[in-house]
Design a protein with these regions (language model features):
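Residue-level recognition of tetratricopeptide repeat
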Residues: 69, 118, 159, 197-200, ...
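The canonical Cys-X-X-Cys-His
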Residues: 262-272
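Canonical tetratricopeptide repeat
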Residues: 75, 124, 165, 206, ...
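Boundary at the C-terminal end of the N-terminal hydrophobic targeting segment
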Residues: 20-24
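Short coil/linker segments at helix-helix boundaries
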Residues: 35-58, 79-111, 117, 124-155, ...
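TPR alpha-solenoid repeat register
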Residues: 72, 121, 162, 203, ...
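TPR/TPR-like (Sel1-like) alpha-helical repeat modules
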Residues: 143-147, 160, 181-191, 217-234, ...
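Bacterial N-terminal signal peptides
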Residues: 8-17
Length: 272
């Protein structure tokens, strides 16, 4: 898979993770707008990419009535990223998509001007910055993005969205920028949340892959066996991993393929 495709699928997963607004005091009108934004987000992640224009338009208008609300700015940033990711996933123009990403980043930055401890804005801004900078081979900027995601987890350690963002962003970064300990912590948290579901099964495989990358083959096998014994759609992939362990190891291409599929389809994040 091309680096640009990996970048866009990773961004898509960030967008498709449902936000947990609000983090600010809301008027009834603002609360209603945020509920509608969340509904648009669920439609978008279900593949209804054509909702993006009205999703963005609603949130561009909303701050006029409540200009100091960080949640609205954060929601607008997510909407811009959704529009960009939707365009690229349906064959749109890269230049138009990048314009949306820039607008999204500006919206997150405005949210952080209003509330410097807004965990979701920090996580998403940091995740996008880390991915883009890694793609552009700018390690210092990527490291700043990683630091923002780490700060977001410190602020909201029990936020599924924040954990998802850091986990999936980190797994998509260049090896020199990855933090295996943080990835393990996030995956373990997410496995507990999703235990017994299809997302949980795929997360177990990803956790096994991380163990394999670190040379902990017995622990990797344990994770694969949990899924391989189940009736889950993920069982076939887990069994293939178990066979691979007896034949020299899991192929890097298979590990990356699953991570890319997670970004494109969000099966780990949302499937049941």
């Amino acid at each position: 898979m091309k680096k640009s495709s990996i970048l866009w699928t990773a961004l898509a997963c960030l967008v498709m993770s449902p936000a947990a607004w609000p983090q600010s005091a809301e008027t009834s009108r603002t609360a209603d707008i945020l509920r509608r934004a969340r509904a648009y987000q669920f439609q978008f992640r279900a593949g209804q990419y054509d909702v993006a224009p009205q999703y963005v338009a609603m949130l561009e208008e909303a701050p006029k009535a409540d200009p100091e609300n960080a949640d609205l700015s954060n929601a607008l940033g997510v909407a811009y990223l959704a529009k960009s990711a939707g365009a690229m996933l349906t064959g749109g123009k890269p230049a138009d998509a990048w314009t949306g990403v820039r607008k999204g980043m500006q919206a997150f930055e405005h949210a952080l001007e209003l509330n410097s401890d807004h965990a979701e804005a920090l996580a998403t801004h940091g995740g996008v910055q880390a991915l883009m900078a890694s793609f552009q081979q700018a390690p210092q900027q990527a490291a700043k993005g990683v630091a923002e995601m780490n700060r977001a987890v410190e602020l909201a350690p029990n936020s599924v969205r924040v954990r998802l963002q850091r986990a999936f962003s980190s797994l998509s970064l260049a090896d020199a920028l990855r933090n295996n300990a943080a990835e393990a912590e996030d995956l373990d948290f997410l496995i507990k949340v999703a235990e017994g579901s299809r997302p949980g099964d795929y997360l177990h495989i990803m956790r096994g892959d991380l163990y394999f990358e670190r040379g902990k083959l017995d622990l990797a096998r344990n994770q694969y066996e949990v899924v391989g014994k189940s009736a889950s759609p993920a069982a076939a992939e887990a069994k293939a991993r178990l066979i691979a362990l007896t034949q020299g190891g899991v192929a890097v291409t298979d590990i990356k393929k699953l991570r890319s599929a997670a970004g494109a389809n969000c099966t780990m994040c949302h499937g049941r």
